[in-house]
Amino acid sequence: MIELPWPPSSLSGHAKGNWHGKAGVTAKHRVWAKAATLAARSMIVVPETGDIRVHVMFYPPSRRGDRVNYPNLMKPYWDGIADALHVNDSRFLPSYGFGEPVKDGKVVVTVG
C-alpha cells in the first residue's frame, strides 16, 4: 500500500497557467510517489508481462471536489510509481474508489 498526499488542483489537465509554474509541483509529486513506492516495494509483486492492477482510493480534504476529476490529478503519481517499479505506466489497469473526507486529504494506492 502506497500512501500519498492529496494532489493540488494545479496537477489537473484542466489547470490554467504557464507550464513552467506547474513543472515544479509535478516533479515534486512524482518524486514523492517514487519514494513512497520504493518504501513499500517489498510488499509489491509486479508481473513480468501484461497488465498491472492498481487500485486507487481517494480520501479528499473536503466534500467540495468533483470525484469525476480526481483521476486527472494522478499523472505525476503514475509516473513516480512506474519509475520505482521499472515499468511503463501504460501497463497499469487502474480502478478507483472514493472514501470519506479526511484532514488534508490523501491518496492510497494498492498495486497487485
Predicted regions and their residues:
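Catalytic phosphate/metal-binding cores of nucleic-acid and nucleotide-processing enzymes, i.e., regions
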Residues: 1-112
